[in-house]
Amino acid sequence: MSSTNRELVHRWFEEVWNKQSEDAIDEMFAPGGKAYGFPEHDSVLIGPDSFKTIHRTFLGAFPDIHITMHDVICENDRVAVTWVARMTHLGDSLGFAPTFQKVSLEGCSVLVVHDGQIHEGRNYMEMGALVHRLKAAAASPLEATQTLA
């Protein structure tokens, strides 16, 4: 079971984020599934449609995102993953002009998998801090020439 869950989570990151497939969200995220902590620490997204709305916003800002999974730990129906997202801020979907900065975001996701779908995801990342730094860079032409990591 845990190897199947591991494979599902690997497919999730590869297809949903790296290949940007909305069909994969419908396939792998349970209808009543909940995603906590994305995009903000106190956010709760319920179901594929809610997740797809945020997914589109995120890809609108970072269309070249690529996530690399690092540690993957499986136990029963839970899969924990540490990951790094590398991307360039190229769009204005976050509500401010693109800075064209290359950025990285480290995170950890703990997912609950049942019957081949993700039913819960708890995400831990510093998205708010990243957006704050990008907003500051957008407001300052000097900072906009520097790379954030």
Segments (PLM) and residue ranges:
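C-terminal and inter-domain tail/linker signature
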Residues: 1-149
